[in-house]
């Protein structure tokens, strides 16, 4: 049996798990691991400029590929800097394994240099935290960590590694476990056949059905059976922010995103539905508005692998616990055996009503404006990339414009912080995607506020030659804050105007990249085309676009209202 130190066990375990990339930042508590990375080899390590960005990069990789992202940080401030990234992944159910250094076991609890209780601090925002106390436990703990992160409802797992168990002078027998199990953890994957049959019968008899798709559908990769059911029953489809791409956005039956800034037709369809078929969703507050007024006539069918998400906010009349792909495949088997009849006249009437809502063209904007509209920037990007880019975003108006005006026809192409709403996510996430998928076009849609949260990662991009397009919608404001202040706080712009902005073009050039400025609508097509060509030639391009600072994101639901209560413009409401 091979004899390895604890640090070597960490690296060998990652290799045996199939890990190709690790994102991290060294420090005293993990120097033995970094030395093992150098001597053992086999893993590409990306040296970030801030630990939060390391987690976002691993997160971007995980969202784009479905693989578990891996992070390595030191103890104390290295670990605490990672917390925002961990919480971001936790809220969106993204599989990560975070390896954090810790002071020696004999010093834990004595306020040693760079000591912090990483297990305790991370506990609210992880699936599980491990503190490894014995060198020989490292392979099994890491095997469990990867299994926990990827199985059931995915999420981040922290493995805290005290410095003394990594000692290079202390060699122990190494064996990578073939299988792993945990007595207290056994997620349900197949659905209850009786519940599935009830759900299928209810869906087939619905007069005003709607399918509501969330991020869980993407995690489960249930696209094929989902589409089969949707097309078989001619069902309208709405999506949460996290679910975009699970069903093709340009498909006739897609009504787009629902919720706070969802389309008029999506929100109206939800409000008036008699059956909601929810797949991998949380019914979070951004998609329900006032729960007391939520979809008053709907029977709710809810498929989710996490039983705690079912009936958490919205009562499920027919709950089905299980992996969405397996449950939908079970549903198709039942459908093949005994297809229930469907009221075709009712469905035709329902679609006529939906088309009347769609005819309002809720996403129209002033395309002839002398100033650049952010909507036009995103539409131009979509056209030039043929809708085939991997798009990351930060948080704010630009995020909503990207979600509404870049139709995603494929899953895992839309990568954003949906649950936590983390500014500074977009750039490092884009670099993580590019690291994993070097041949793909990767675009970070950001704003003048968000980009400055982690702009230092432009240095990481240069070091590792990660050519992405950074598209900065620069409105000189914290745009979404300003929009709320305009609409709710009588236009009092308290601390939302971004004074003393840098020259982003020259800043990008200082980091060694290409910088481009767009100030007029007639420049959009040519300069974005130029930017994309630079990216194809292996250069990161930072495009600073001066957009109309007065533009709002519409539709916007009215606070405290139902799904059907929205502002459609500054002067028009439902």
Swiss-Prot record:
Gene Ontology, cellular component aspect? acetolactate synthase complex
What Gene3D superfamilies has UniProt attached to this entry? 3.40.50.970, TPP-binding domain (3.40.50.1220)
Supply the EC number(s).
2.2.1.6
The reaction(s) annotated as catalysed by this protein in its Swiss-Prot or TrEMBL entry are:
2 pyruvate + H(+) = (2S)-2-acetolactate + CO2
Question: What is stated about the way this protein's activity is regulated?
Answer: Sensitive to valine inhibition.
Q: Which domain of life is it from?
A: Bacteria
Disulfide pairings:
none
Which EC class does it fall in?
transferase
Classification via InterPro entries: Acetolactate_synth_lsu, AHAS_TPP, DHS-like_NAD/FAD-binding_dom, THDP-binding, Thiamin_PyroP_enz_cen_dom, Thiamin_PyroP_enz_TPP-bd_dom, TPP-bd_CS, TPP_enz
So, what pathway does this thing act in?
A: Amino-acid biosynthesis; L-isoleucine biosynthesis; L-isoleucine from 2-oxobutanoate: step 1/4; Amino-acid biosynthesis; L-valine biosynthesis; L-valine from pyruvate: step 1/4
One GO MF annotation is: thiamine pyrophosphate binding
Residue ranges of the region described as Thiamine pyrophosphate binding: 397-477
Residues binding FAD, per UniProt: 153, 261-282, 304-323
**Residues engaged in binding thiamine diphosphate:** 51
The prosthetic group or cofactor this protein requires is:
Mg(2+); thiamine diphosphate
Query: In the UniProt record, does the keyword Transferase occur?
Result: yes
The free-text note explaining how the cofactor binds reads: Binds 1 Mg(2+) ion per subunit.
How this chain assembles, per its entry, is: Dimer of chain H and chain I.
Q: Which family does it belong to?
A: Belongs to the TPP enzyme family.
Q: Which NCBIfam families does the entry link to?
A: acolac_lg, PRK06466.1, PRK07979.1, PRK08979.1
User: Please, what other remarks does the record include?
Assistant: S.typhimurium contains genes for 3 AHAS isozymes: ilvBN, ilvGM and ilvIH.
> By what name is this protein known?
Acetolactate synthase isozyme 3 large subunit
Question: What is the scientific name of the source organism?
Answer: Salmonella typhimurium (strain LT2 / SGSC1412 / ATCC 700720)
